[in-house]
């Protein structure tokens, strides 16, 4: 709004009547458009001249800036002033009625409620209320009198529970994530992927100053000292103990012989021990003597107490623990459950001396275990990996350890703990005492274990790996998996009526499936395998021990060490992966002399395991069913090993090939005799192309002729001879040394075509390949006859014309393979058998023997002169072809027809009688065998 003084065309005043636009040359800067600019426009300076600026009213500056006449800043000033035209929000006055409503709404009406601000407001309100409540409680406590602080205040347990409720993740570090397979021993054939725990680093013991300690606490009782060596042997035999090692201590037979003090004896009596078990009788004296030990005994035999009692004596002899000291005794075991069980035993007996025990195993709280170790404990029962973790984290150390035990040691070496076990042993002082215990100990594992021992004493109670005879084993052969399920559901209620039932399954997935199926059938049961949380495993075992659940389905994680007396039945629903695991499985019942039953369910595909199971049953004096034996015989390795030394006996399987592989317990003697109709002389056995050229063909022919000759018809007397020589002449298994004929064959001497003749016209050099069963041990008068007969006739059929010198050399070296058989005599490795035949031909035993040995040999041996062999007896000629048969016939006659001996004596030359002792001895098999002549020693004498 401009003030105009008036002039030509312009009214005086503010110019409400019209507007004027200045038309002068010099334009005045435009004023910012404001609300009052509509009242008038700037006019030209018509009255004051061109250069005079217009005069503004005095109230012009109200609500506006001073005009900026600087052209350079005009542009920016316009923008700044344009932004000031924004309308300001409405702000009600203090006493306005709308102010309260204004405050109840957020300033920014477009945004919603912020949840974080609402939550924080609630937290603040809650905190305020809690503080107010606490203040009120404090006031009440001050006002009320007669309050006992020891009751009202929180004790340690309440404080701990409150703290854990407020801090559920307390003590859990990031490294302690769930790793359920760390110590899993469920027995899967494929080793599960485990958390790799690096072993402890090597340590230089020479830099550490270890204090000395005493290991030997055994004072032998006078009753034991007074035992004679024979009585000591009888005592160990009675306890079924086998002890090896340097100077083992004598076993005790009662607790009085151990020399325990009254405190420990009170605890032992409280545990209802009446007398020590066999492994304790020998193991406790060995451990008290400070010796390293390998203890092997069947399951449930008291191995745990055998190393815990000496451990307490060992600990009590040393000074008390100081702050920062590690344990004195460390017991290492493979599974968590076994660790907890040994820990419970250690606490029970350690109460006698107020000794502390700590269980350290995977799955437990690392923080709690570390705290218990730092507080100090004389005994630590642990699994290998967790102990290594604690040593690495400085929760404990092994400097004071002087008593180290590995329970179920073979399992730890077998499960892949070997490096960890060795690193633990290497971190303990070198002069420690180390004990290894297990129920099974294979030779390979024992060699590995001996590296950490020094001059150990090996104590074996019973047989290594033998099953407990208190457990009755029953094997069920079923057709398939569904058959096993039907069998189980049909019998399970019956089993639970007699006691708790433990079901073993090989794989974890199968265990869960079986448990779920049984639950659907309405059975109350528990499940235990390596993938479960440790708390769940503990709860299941606790409920099973308390008989809250009658059935437990488990993998092999429960196969070792669990001592639950209520288990009366063990069922191997799946077979174990090896016989050692099977032994431990069935050992969960029949504990401490109690009786139990173990069922093993087999299917046709389990033939490999059936062979091991047969031997396990036989070793425990259990019944082996025919079905189980037939299943085991389907396995080739068992069938072959069964032939060599087993109890089985197979039917005669004839036909081509090397028959001895198919005949268990039969036919070592008859293998030495082929049929001379097939091969008439040694020329047929020349190896033409190689070491096994025609030799293999000859062997096959010999065996074929052997079977053909079994059933040749003949007269009554000849049948006797034939049956005795060819059918029942002491067949033994290939590789054995017990080749003793069982029947007389003399009746067939006078029959040229008798079965004994056809059966014995064989080739003595090819019987029982690979063994020495055909060679006699003590046979008489070969030397005597050889000496006397070398001077007689040169009527050998093959006409090799062996000289007397050759004959004498053969006689003296009949035990070697030097005798002359014409062209082929030196080709035959079994030539000692021809010499043995001569040894067996005692003149005083046979009326025809002197003539039989004159020209009986068609092999060109030339050791017997004359042709009386052919005229006297065809049997003698045949025996000449096969010295082994002649030997056998003489041996049979010595047993079956002793009445012939006096008749034979007159026909024996006086020179022979000078060199032959007519006395005969009985062998261990009950067969009469004459004493050997006085002659030079041969290799058979040894």
Swiss-Prot record:
This protein's record includes keyword Phosphoprotein: yes
Chain spans, region Disordered: 1-114, 182-203, 737-762, 783-942
Sites of the Glycyl lysine isopeptide (Lys-Gly) (interchain with G-Cter in SUMO2) crosslink: 899
Cited CDD domains: DEADc_DDX42 (cd17952), SF2_C_DEAD (cd18787)
Positions carrying Phosphoserine: 58, 96, 104, 109, 111, 185, 754
Gene Ontology biological-process entries: protein localization; regulation of apoptotic process; U2-type prespliceosome assembly
EC code(s) of this entry: 3.6.4.13
Basic and acidic residues bias (residue ranges): 820-924
SUPFAM superfamilies: P-loop containing nucleoside triphosphate hydrolases
Biased composition (Gly residues): 1-18
Parts forming coiled coils: 116-157
Residues carrying N6-acetyllysine: 5
Composition bias, Polar residues: 737-760, 786-798
MF annotations from Gene Ontology: ATP binding; ATP hydrolysis activity; RNA binding; RNA helicase activity
Residue span(s) of domain Helicase C-terminal: 487-632
Compartmental location: Cytoplasm; Nucleus
Protein family membership: Belongs to the DEAD box helicase family. DDX42 subfamily.
Protein name: ATP-dependent RNA helicase DDX42
Species this protein is from: Pongo abelii (Sumatran orangutan)
Lineage: Eukaryota, Metazoa, Chordata, Craniata, Vertebrata
């Amino acid at each position: 709004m401009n003030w105009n003084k008036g002039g030509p065309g312009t009214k005086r005043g503010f110019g409400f009547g019209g507007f004027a636009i200045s038309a002068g040359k010099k334009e005045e800067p435009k004023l910012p458009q404001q609300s009052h600019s509509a009242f008038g426009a700037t006019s030209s300076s018509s009255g004051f001249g061109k250069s005079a600026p217009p005069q503004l009213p005095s109230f012009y500056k109200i609500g506006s800036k001073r005009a900026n006449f600087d052209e350079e800043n005009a542009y920016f000033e316009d923008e700044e002033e344009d932004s000031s035209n924004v309308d300001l929000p409405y702000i009600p006055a203090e006493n306005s009625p709308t102010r309260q409503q204004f405050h109840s709404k957020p300033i920014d009406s477009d945004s919603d409620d912020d949840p974080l601000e609402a939550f924080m407001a609630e937290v603040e309100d809650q905190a305020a209320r809690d503080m107010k409540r606490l203040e009120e409680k404090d006031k009440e406590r001050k006002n009320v009198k007669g309050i006992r602080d020891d009751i009202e205040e929180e004790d340690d347990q309440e404080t701990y529970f409150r703290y854990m409720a407020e801090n559920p993740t307390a003590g859990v570090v990031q490294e302690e994530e769930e790793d359920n397979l760390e110590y899993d021993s469920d027995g899967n054939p494929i080793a599960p992927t485990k958390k790799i725990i690096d072993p402890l680093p090597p340590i230089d013991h020479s830099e550490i100053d270890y204090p000395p300690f005493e290991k030997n606490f055994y004072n032998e009782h006078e009753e034991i000292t007074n035992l004679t060596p024979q009585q000591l042997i009888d005592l160990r035999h009675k306890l079924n103990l086998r002890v090896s090692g340097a100077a083992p201590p004598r076993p005790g037979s009662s607790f009085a012989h151990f020399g325990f003090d009254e405190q420990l004896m009170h605890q032992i009596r409280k545990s209802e021990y009446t007398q020590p078990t066999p492994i304790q009788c020998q193991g406790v004296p060995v451990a008290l003597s400070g010796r390293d030990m390998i203890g092997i005994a069947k399951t449930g035999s008291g191995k745990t107490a055998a190393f815990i009692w000496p451990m307490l004596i060992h600990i009590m002899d040393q000074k008390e623990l100081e702050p920062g000291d590690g344990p004195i005794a460390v017991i290492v075991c493979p599974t968590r459950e076994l660790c907890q069980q040994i820990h419970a035993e250690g606490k029970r007996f350690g109460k006698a001396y107020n000794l502390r025990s700590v269980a350290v195993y995977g799955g437990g709280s690392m923080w709690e275990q570390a705290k218990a170790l730092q507080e100090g404990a004389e005994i630590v029962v642990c699994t290998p990996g967790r102990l290594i973790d604690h040593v690495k984290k400085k929760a404990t150390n092994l400097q004071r350890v002087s008593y180290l035990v590995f329970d179920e040691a073979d399992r730890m070496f077998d499960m892949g703990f070997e490096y960890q076990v060795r690193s633990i042993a290497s971190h303990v002082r070198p002069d420690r005492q180390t004990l290894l215990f297990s129920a099974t100990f294979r030779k390979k594992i024992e060699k590995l274990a001996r590296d950490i021992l020094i001059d150990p004493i090996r104590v074996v109670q019973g047989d290594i790996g033998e099953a407990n005879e208190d457990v009755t084993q029953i094997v069920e052969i079923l057709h398939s998996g569904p058959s096993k399920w039907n069998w189980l559901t049909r019998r399970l209620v019956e089993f639970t009526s007699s006691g708790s039932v433990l079901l073993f399954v090989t794989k974890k997935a199968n265990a869960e499936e079986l448990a779920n199926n049984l639950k659907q059938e309405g059975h109350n049961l528990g499940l235990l395998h390596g993938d479960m949380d440790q708390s769940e495993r503990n709860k299941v075992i606790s409920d099973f021990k308390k008989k809250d659940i009658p059935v437990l389905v488990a993998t092999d994680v429960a196969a070792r060490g669990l001592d639950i007396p209520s288990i009366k039945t063990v069922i191997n629903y799946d077979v174990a992966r090896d016989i050692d695991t099977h032994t431990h499985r069935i050992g969960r019942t029949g504990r401490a002399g109690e009786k139990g039953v173990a069922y093993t369910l087999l299917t046709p595909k389990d033939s490999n395991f059936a062979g091991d199971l047969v031997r396990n049953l036989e070793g425990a004096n259990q019944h082996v069913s025919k079905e189980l034996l037939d299943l085991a015989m389907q396995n080739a390795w068992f069938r072959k090993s069964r032939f060599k030394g087993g109890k089985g006996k197979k039917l005669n399987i004839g036909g081509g090939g090397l028959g001895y592989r198919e005949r268990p317990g039969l036919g070592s003697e008859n293998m030495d005799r082929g049929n001379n109709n097939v091969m008439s002389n040694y020329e047929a056995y020349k190896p033409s192309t190689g070491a096994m050229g025609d030799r293999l063909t000859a062997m096959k022919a010999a065996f074929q002729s052997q079977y053909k000759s079994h059933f040749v018809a003949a007269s009554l007397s000849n049948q006797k001879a034939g049956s005795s020589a060819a059918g029942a002449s002491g067949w033994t298994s290939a590789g054995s040394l017990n080749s003793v004929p069982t029947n007389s064959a003399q009746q067939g001497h006078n029959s040229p075509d008798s079965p004994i003749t056809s059966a014995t016209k064989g080739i003595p050099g090819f019987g029982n390949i690979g063994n020495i069963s055909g060679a006699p041990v003590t046979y008489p008068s070969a030397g005597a006859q050889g000496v006397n007969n070398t001077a007689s006739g040169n009527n050998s059929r093959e006409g090799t014309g062996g000289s007397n010198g050759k004959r004498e050399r053969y006689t003296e070296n009949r035990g070697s393979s030097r005798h002359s058989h014409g062209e082929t005599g030196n080709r035959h490795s079994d030539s000692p058998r021809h010499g043995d035949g001569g040894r067996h031909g005692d003149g005083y035993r046979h009326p025809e023997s002197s003539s039989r040995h004159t020209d009986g040999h068609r092999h060109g041996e030339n050791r017997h002169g004359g042709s009386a062999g052919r005229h006297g007896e065809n049997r003698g000629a045949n025996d000449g072809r096969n010295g082994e048969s002649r030997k056998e016939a003489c041996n049979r006659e010595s047993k079956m027809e002793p009445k012939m001996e006096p008749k034979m004596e007159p026909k024996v030359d006086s020179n022979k009688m000078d060199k032959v002792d007519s006395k005969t001895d009985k062998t261990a098999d009950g067969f009469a065998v004459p004493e050997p002549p006085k002659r030079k020693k041969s290799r058979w004498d040894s």
